[in-house]
From Swiss-Prot:
Pro residues bias (residue ranges): 338-366
Species: Drosophila melanogaster (Fruit fly)
Compartment list: Nucleus
Residue ranges, compositional bias (Basic and acidic residues): 162-179
Annotated protein name in UniProt: Fork head domain transcription factor slp2
Keyword Ribonucleoprotein in record: no
Biased composition (Low complexity): 94-104, 419-430
GO terms under cellular component: nucleus
Any GO BP: segment polarity determination
PANTHER family: FORKHEAD BOX PROTEIN G1
UniProt superkingdom: Eukaryota
Tissues where the protein occurs: Expressed in the posterior half of each parasegment just anterior to the parasegmental boundary.
Keywords: Developmental protein, DNA-binding, Nucleus, Segmentation polarity protein, Transcription, Transcription regulation
4Fe-4S as UniProt keyword: no
């Protein structure tokens, strides 16, 4: 930045002006008059360029070029304003734009050339990033519709699992020419356990199987054993079983989890896959039906629980017998109503010889909770009391029938109906023979004892 002081002679001003021009941008050899007039038209050219830069570009996307040049040119504009303030009216205004073609740094073509790399950078573009190799395709995406819980069963989280193929697409080979098997560590572990005689192996047994069947790992022992241990610990398909104290040897056994029955090894990827989830879901639903169906018959009122209650007839009856044995307070389902015992009214009433059964209570409309279980317990106690009262009434009726049959053995008289009830009138005169006293006092004695 050149500072021009007032009071300097015109020759010094021209020298400073020439120094200003040659310091910033070299010019071709011109006359002294053009050198004196060049600084001010340059400022006008900068103003025109700033206006051109501020004009919005007719593009569909936002460009960084509309931001960065404006900030740079604001700084140049401030410098020119300072120069113009300190040198007022020293140079006559020249509206000739011939210097636009002579200056290299004031041409709009050079300015556009400098901003071309920036204008190509689109900030707001929603286009995806370029793919490194479009020919590469993830094999997991092909089998995605057939795979479920793949991360859970085949999580390659180890650093020792290298690529099975080199950069040129050929299989990886060691110094002896042994190819690396196209299987993941989880697949190797599953093959080792499934092909064992007892369906279980120790860690050393898994190592031995891998090195025996795949010589590549026998000759290259760099980190793959640590990866095997890592996958055994993290994968849910493998379960650690402690060794029995009578079993000699060291280390725990590793077995396959029962949920890994549908897991197989993919032929194209060499990783673990689940065959179909429909079979596993059907087995899980059948298991839930076998558990929930017999225990909660009141859920039949809910249509959303129908799938759990319509269990097949091949469900084990042992579960129902154990439920009846260990849960005596749960009501037994009858043919008429599933939640009440057969042949009993809904609410306990006074015992009667031939009382009609009361109306059945409304069906269960709520899933069993703790309060409902408590109500069932109270209801069961009431049922026991009602059953005891009904048994006592039946016993009394049986005794009365026995007394009536015993009283009907003598010749029939007019007093026999009264005797059957138990009222034996005493003959005041004693002239009537009267029945035998033993049948008369037998029902009275039995009734008084039970009462």
């Amino acid at each position: 930045m050149v500072k021009i002081e007032e009071g300097l002679p015109s020759s010094e001003i021209s020298a400073h002006s020439l120094h200003f021009q040659h310091h910033h941008h070299p010019l071709p050899p011109t006359t002294h008059h053009s050198a004196l007039q060049s600084p001010h038209p340059v400022g006008l050219n900068l103003t025109n360029l700033m206006k051109m830069a501020r004009t919005p570009h007719l593009k569909s996307s936002f460009s960084i070029n509309s931001i960065l040049p404006e900030t740079v040119e604001h700084h140049d504009e401030d410098e020119e304003e300072d120069v113009e303030k300190k040198s007022p009216a020293k140079f006559p205004p020249n509206h000739n734009n011939n210097n636009l073609n002579t200056t290299n740094w004031g041409s709009p073509e050079d300015h556009e050339a400098e901003s071309d790399p920036e204008s190509d950078l689109d900030v707001t573009s929603m286009s995806p990033a370029p793919v490194a190799n479009p020919n590469e395709s993830d094999p997991d995406e092909v089998d995605e519709e057939f795979v479920e819980e793949d991360i859970e069963c085949d999580g390659e989280t180890t650093d020792g699992d290298a690529e099975n193929k080199s950069n040129d697409g050929k299989p990886v080979k060691d110094k002896k020419g042994n190819e690396k098997p196209p299987y993941s560590y989880n697949a190797l572990i599953m093959m080792a356990i499934r092909q064992s005689s007892e369906k279980r192996l120790t860690l050393n047994g898994i190592y031995e199987y891998i090195m025996t069947n795949h010589p590549y790992y026998r000759d290259n022992k760099q980190g793959w054993q640590n990866s095997i241990r890592h996958n055994l610990s993290l994968n849910k398909c493998f379960v650690k079983v402690p060794r029995h104290y009578d079993d000699p040897g060291k280390g725990n056994y590793w077995m396959l989890d029962p949920s890994a029955e549908d897991v197989f090894i993919g032929g194209s990827t060499g990783k673990l896959r689940r065959r179909t989830t429909a079979a596993s879901r059907s087995r899980l639903a059948a298991f839930k039906r076998s558990l929930i169906g017999p225990m909660f018959p009141g859920l039949a009122a809910y249509p959303q629980f129908g799938q759990f209650l319509t269990y097949p007839p091949t469900a084990p009856s042992l579960l129902a017998s154990m439920y009846q044995r260990y849960n005596p307070f749960a009501p037994k389902g009858g043919p008429g109503h599933p939640g009440l015992p057969p042949g009993l009214p809904g609410l306990p009433g006074p015992p009667g010889p031939q009382g009609p059964p009361g109306p059945p209570p409304p069906p269960f409309v709520a899933p069993p909770t703790s309060s409902e279980l408590y109500q069932r317990l109270q209801y069961q106690q009431l049922l026991h009391q009602h059953a005891a009262a009904a048994a006592l009434a039946a016993h009394q009726r049986q005794l009365s029938v026995a007394a009536a049959s015993a009283a009907s053995q003598p010749p029939p008289t007019h007093h026999h109906p009264h005797l059957a009830v138990g009222q034996a009138p005493l003959s005041p005169g004693g002239d009537s023979p009267g029945p035998s006293p033993q049948p008369l006092h037998k029902p009275v004695t039995v009734v008084s004892r039970n009462s």
